[in-house]
Amino acid sequence: MKAEATVIPSRCARGLPSWQVLSPVQPWQTSAPQNTTQPKLLAPHQHEKSQKKSSLLKELGAFHITIALLHLVFGGYLASIVKNLHLVVLKSWYPFWGAASFLISGILAITMKTFSKTYLKMLCLMTNLISLFCVLSGLFVISKDLFLESPFESPIWRMYPNSTVHIQRLELALLCFTVLELFLPVPTAVTAWRGDCPSAKNDDACLVPNTPLHLKGLPVEPPPSYQSVIQGDAQHKQHQRLREVKQVAPDTWIVTDGAAIWTQTAN
């Protein structure tokens, strides 16, 4: 009787690995990017640095305003008590236009902390430059009153001062405030110029460059070659267990399962 053989593959041969079932060059492997970029975000260290500069600019502006108010107070008091003395500092009205210059510089410096615009930055630089010239002019006129063309008869260190000595001491205090103002315009201008957030271009945000973000769970290696796929398929078939059934009689079959051979009957 002619034997009829049937080959039944085992369960382990029902499916191949996903990289063997698909073609060697997969679309998702070639088209999907291995890395992507994050959106532009505010860098923490740059944000902290920007906040420190803004705080410093605010403090410098507060010093400007304080010295301006002191100039107004001392200048107004000097103008009210001086009668017969010829003071260049009052004839030139330095305590008032100097105070106005310092006040505008301080207000612009504080405003830049809230509204960091390009035109405000330029205005702040210009007003601080003008304040520097005002300070130099004030030093000249006060020094002329106290040292060069002094209208005071008594020295400032007199033990029993009169009204003239009081005026001289007030002008000396005004000189001290002017010297303090001398150290403010340049740091204020530099801090305003080196600000990191020129909001006219990036809407008040300091942005960092795009950085690569590696996606987890996606393959980043190149696709396997055709030879490696064929070799892997051959090795898989060698380990695959095949079942061969031969019918030797109407009710008898010989089953070969690779490792063993047995006979199976219909009963």
From Swiss-Prot:
Residues 1-61, 113-121, 193-267 are cytoplasmic. One of its GO terms (biological process) is cell surface receptor signaling pathway. GO terms for cellular component: plasma membrane. Residues 83-91, 143-171 are extracellular. It is found in: Membrane. The keyword NAD does not apply. The chain crosses the membrane at residues 62-82, 92-112, 122-142, 172-192. Its main location: membrane. Pfam families: CD20 (PF04103). Keywords: Membrane, Receptor, Transmembrane, Transmembrane helix. It comes from the Eukaryota. Belongs to the MS4A family. PANTHER family: MEMBRANE-SPANNING 4-DOMAINS SUBFAMILY A MEMBER 10, MEMBRANE-SPANNING 4-DOMAINS SUBFAMILY A MS4A -RELATED. May be involved in signal transduction as a component of a multimeric receptor complex. This is Membrane-spanning 4-domains subfamily A member 10. It comes from Homo sapiens. The gene is MS4A10.
